[in-house]
């Protein structure tokens, strides 16, 4: 997966409330959700690219705010 794929997935999530709700669910499988949305993302990809994402991208993935928290998959809420 390229950084562009990850950023494209994040952009899609930011614009799609259905994806946001799926990612907010307890135990959400980010890789499976991304795959269902047409993206090929692995857990390793998420972990290796996490440090390259801006705070705004991380916060916006699931409609989160800086006062929220991050789950183990890298997405903040």
UniProtKB/Swiss-Prot annotation:
Note the position of the cross-link Beta-methyllanthionine (Thr-Cys): 72-76
Q: What is its main location?
A: secreted
Q: Which GO terms describe its cellular component?
A: extracellular region
Tell me the residues on which 2,3-didehydrobutyrine occurs: 65
Pfam families xref list: Nif11 (PF07862)
Residue span(s) of the pro-peptide:
1-64
Q: What processing steps or modifications follow its translation?
A: Cross-links are proved in vitro, when coepressed in E.coli with the ProcM lanthionine synthetase.
Question: The cross-link Lanthionine (Ser-Cys): at which residues?
Answer: 67-70
Induction per UniProt is: Down-regulated under nitrogen starvation.
Q: Which InterPro entries match?
A: CHP03798_Ocin, Nif11
Q: What does this protein do?
A: Lanthionine-containing peptide (lantipeptide) with unknown function. Does not show antibiotic activity against Lactococcus lactis 117 and Bacillus subtilis 6633 bacteria. Organisms that produce this peptide live in oligotrophic environments at very dilute concentrations, suggesting this peptide is not secreted to influence other bacteria.
Q: What protein does this entry describe?
A: Lantipeptide prochlorosin 4.3
Protein species of origin = Prochlorococcus marinus (strain MIT 9313)
């Amino acid at each position: 997966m390229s950084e562009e794929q990850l950023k494209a997935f994040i952009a899609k999530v930011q614009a799609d409330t259905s994806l946001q709700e799926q990612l907010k669910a307890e135990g959400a499988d980010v890789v499976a959700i991304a795959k269902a949305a047409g993206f090929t993302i692995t857990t390793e990809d998420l972990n290796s690219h996490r440090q390259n994402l801006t705070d705004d991208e991380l916060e916006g993935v699931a409609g989160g705010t800086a006062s929220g928290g991050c789950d183990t998959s890298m997405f903040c809420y």
